[in-house]
């Protein structure tokens, strides 16, 4: 079964929120069908760090990335979620 790899940039509410803390909250909020394949901090400016994530999800997910974006946006400490890339992934 093929999956889709979604590259996201997640911006925190403020500069005090660290990417590692944000990652833990997001990972805990994601349903089982979503898998975090990779994550890293991305410096933005003035001490603000975004979180870049690659999340694997089933290819046949109805509505594309909308559900994933909504779940992450609802996590406390998240200000904005940007989908940077979506690609098919098999393996």
Swiss-Prot record:
Family matches, as InterPro entries: eEF-1beta-like_sf (IPR036219), EF1B_bsu/dsu_GNE (IPR014038), Transl_elong_EF1B/ribsomal_bS6 (IPR014717), Transl_elong_EF1B_B_arc (IPR004542)
Q: Which UniProt keywords apply?
A: Elongation factor, Protein biosynthesis
Q: Example GO molecular function term?
A: translation elongation factor activity
Q: Which family does it belong to?
A: Belongs to the EF-1-beta/EF-1-delta family.
NCBIfam families linked to this entry: aEF-1_beta, PRK00435.1
What this chain does, per the record? Answer: Promotes the exchange of GDP for GTP in EF-1-alpha/GDP, thus allowing the regeneration of EF-1-alpha/GTP that could then be used to form the ternary complex EF-1-alpha/GTP/AAtRNA.
Report what the protein is called.
Elongation factor 1-beta
Organism, scientific name = Thermofilum pendens (strain DSM 2475 / Hrk 5)
């Amino acid at each position: 079964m093929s999956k889709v790899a979604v590259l996201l940039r997640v911006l925190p509410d403020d500069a005090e929120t660290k990417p590692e803390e944000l990652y833990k909250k997001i990972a805990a909020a994601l349903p089982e069908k979503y898998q975090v394949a990779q994550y890293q901090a991305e410096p933005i400016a003035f001490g603000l760090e975004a979180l870049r994530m690659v999340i694997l999800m089933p290819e046949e997910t109805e509505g594309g990335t909308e559900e994933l974006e909504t779940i992450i946006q609802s996590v406390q400490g998240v200000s904005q979620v940007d989908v940077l890339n979506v690609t098919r992934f098999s393996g």
